[in-house]
């Protein structure tokens, strides 16, 4: 270790407690698993440690209320959920079964019961749930432009406008061509320096909090690491994408409060059963919707100012020359600067603001979640924690992470991707068919496949894919080493298996190596454009936790 720990974290199976609940007391979580990881530190020899994942739900509904709601839902299902899709299995259940845990947990149970492709009907809505890499590949890569984002676009459009995630296909194609070149190697090399400086500040802040609490003579200290990692991710997005210092690691500004308010509203909309915010007067009558509009106004005002300032100092240049800049020494190495300076791209301010808002929302949650879960998993596996510490000490010594050194930190990188395998962010990818299609039957499904009409909503369950017993050995175990070896189930017809040599030079395992059994950032043309940014950011932050000894 580089420095002696200020406070020791001791976590064992005996004193480790986990509780998983949905993010809302009344609705299932469909897009993400918001979580809160709490450590209790003690400065005495007897240490008490507990981890709590997510907030605790309120009181359970009375059974009679559940029955009334279920009966109404079942009636709507029978009347409005549409015809059967040939021989496709149908999963039907009580809608209130989803209230006490995230939706994707139930989707996993039904996957084991009904197979890799099944129809799920609840109330007036029906979905096709996919838990098979062959079918996922068919939708995401082979027929990528026969599907759009569907329900997801409906939810996110009021927040992200025409940003990359909710954008229609034509807008997406135009913006992807512009944004993708911005994540070039020189930019990522400079970002590693930024990741390091921001992460070091966060870890030092955590240690100072522990040291300060210890001086007060408290027997235990509760520290919300998820909140600290969220602040870290927000600061990195601000500086790396906008060239704007949110100051989120050290203080809380009105912009930060507005950002978190918007994040909470995005989560709320993704989990609420009835889209009441679409009602004409909701934005003025409903208090949380009024607050949401106020938060959007604060963020948009901030982004408009950043765009205006960037355009005032615009230096128009070809893409090739932009990528050749010395980003390590630029005063402004942000992605916004790259987009504004790109020759021949006269995008209007509104579209640019939508792009930035999308990066702010999407780029913030993944990093905070993966770091929190990584700490959780390492706490349960002290042998792997020691192995990671040994690698950091060997590769870095007294030095700091660099782009080149990241290539040597193999085990740390594998910890990040194994965390994303077990706890993907998001656990579901949502698509809607734009025309009729025939889905492959998938493993143990109908060999003739399943015909679906235009307008069919599809849930690709990343959680199910990542924990499928058909494609992973010991799928529920935390084994970063699994990504180093080939894995091929010959019983699965049409799946090429897991082969690290399939994508030579890749720093991190991806959908190509796994033939779509591993999809933490999606796959195909509409795969997340900032995946390498997020993966490197998480890797560097985890390394800094070891370098500055946030735990033993």
Swiss-Prot record:
It comes from Pisum sativum (Garden pea). Gene3D superfamilies: Cytochrome P450. Coiled coil: none annotated. Its cofactor is heme. Disulfide bonds: none annotated. It is found in: Plastid, Chloroplast membrane. This is Cytochrome P450 97B1, chloroplastic. Belongs to the cytochrome P450 family. It is an enzyme of class 1 (oxidoreductase). Residues 1-52 form a transit peptide. Its EC number is 1.14.-.-. Keywords: Chloroplast, Heme, Iron, Membrane, Metal-binding, Monooxygenase, Oxidoreductase, Plastid, Transit peptide. It holds the Pfam family p450. InterPro entries: Cyt_P450, Cyt_P450_CS, Cyt_P450_E_grp-I, Cyt_P450_sf, Cytochrome_P450_Monoox. One of its GO terms (cellular component) is chloroplast membrane. Heme binds at residue 528. Its main location: plastid.
